[in-house]
Amino acid sequence: MAERVELLERRVRELERELELARGGRASARARIETMSPEVTDSNPYSRLMALKRMGIVKDYEKIRTFTVAIVGVGGVGSVTAEMLTRCGIGKLLLFDYDKVELANMNRLFFQPHQAGLSKVQAAEHTLRNINPDVQFEVHNYNITTLDNFEHFMDRISNGALEEGKPVDLVLSCVDNFEARMAINTACNELGQIWMESGVSENAVSGHIQLIIPGESACFACAPPLVVAANIDEKTLKREGVCAASLPTTMGVVAGILVQNVLKYLLNFGTVSYYLGYNAMQDFFPTMAMKPNPQCSDQNCRKQQENYKIKEAAQPKQEEIHQEEEIVHEDNDWGIELVSETTEDELKAASGPVPDLPVGITVAYTIPNKEENLTAEETVAESEESLEDLMAKMRNL
């Protein structure tokens, strides 16, 4: 009975907060801005973003308002990712999460204590609308891994762009479990949807982002973690009273490099990373590109690989042009030759023994032999003359 009362009281507080936000939460929000302006004024939220265009980094920054991005998971990484894209002026955001804000989340970024009890997508939407009312938001408070919700999730990423009926430009995975990652992977492979995956380790000191283009790069099932490859139920790995570590610093770094990769991909500047890792212990950022697995367990991935091969074969082949190096001073009118100061016999004598190596392997250099009983040449002659006599001779020179 006590639990039921506590649940009802929490629900009442949640409804009161929603009512308060609906009444006055947006009163101080600025008016919508129809077009981005490079004008440098205190009231222009886009002036510093438009400076990227003036400095030659981005050709057409205003294009960002035409893009739609779906974010699955609005937790430590996803909420900060949504905030960054909102501040950058993205056209539309689709947010998917079924969890609620808890006080245990306060060690992370974005959410505030007074939002405890609200669903993450609702709390995020209220905050993000106040940050930038120019962005359109569509939120879904459900678990995408259930059958019905999965079908709806696929429908929204296929038809939920700014222009209804068009697919989103990018899907971002910011979830914290393999089941949800595999659900996103399955949907994107079936639809041919480009997406980016992100994650933070359980010890909170490393993370990664990965760009996945179906058929062109490895999907999440091509090289799955052990927990997926061995068909282990990850729920059995969690114990009562035990949770993963969480640092706002690591999550902020991962969210930052994820959004940076998103901006480079959408606005076509810089080099887009297929995989970028982060090791906080050594400040190490490894990068790599992973090719798809021809024996991938996902049949849609294998199908996308075949489609990509056909597409590549249809592209006209570009012939590589090899330029011959020009010979400088080909004519040697003066008969100049390069002569070594060391003869071959002297070189062999100075070289160390050549080790016994297999056929085809040679050494770049050998260790010189150590000559024994070497004495330095005498450069100082002994004399019975005094120091004063020697100084007098020096003055007379």
Curated annotation (Swiss-Prot):
Residues 340-370 are annotated as: Linker. GO terms for molecular function: ATP binding; protein homodimerization activity; UFM1 activating enzyme activity; zinc ion binding. Zn(2+) binds at residues 219, 222, 296, 301. The keyword Endoplasmic reticulum applies. The active site is at 243 (glycyl thioester intermediate). Pfam families: ThiF. A motif (UFC1-binding sequence (UFC)) lies at residues 382-397. The keyword Endoplasmic reticulum applies. InterPro entries: D-isomer_DH_CS1, ThiF/MoeB/HesA, ThiF_NAD_FAD-bd, Ubiquitin-activating_enz. The UFC1-binding sequence (UFC) motif mediates interaction with UFC1. Homodimer; homodimerization is required for UFM1 activation. Interacts (via UIS motif) with UFM1; binds UFM1 via a trans-binding mechanism in which UFM1 interacts with distinct sites in both subunits of the UBA5 homodimer. Interacts (via C-terminus) with UFC1. Belongs to the ubiquitin-activating E1 family. UBA5 subfamily. E1-like enzyme which specifically catalyzes the first step in ufmylation. Activates UFM1 by first adenylating its C-terminal glycine residue with ATP, and thereafter linking this residue to the side chain of a cysteine residue in E1, yielding a UFM1-E1 thioester and free AMP. Activates UFM1 via a trans-binding mechanism, in which UFM1 interacts with distinct sites in both subunits of the UBA5 homodimer. Trans-binding also promotes stabilization of the UBA5 homodimer, and enhances ATP-binding. Transfer of UFM1 from UBA5 to the E2-like enzyme UFC1 also takes place using a trans mechanism. This is Ubiquitin-like modifier-activating enzyme 5. It comes from Gallus gallus. The gene is UBA5.
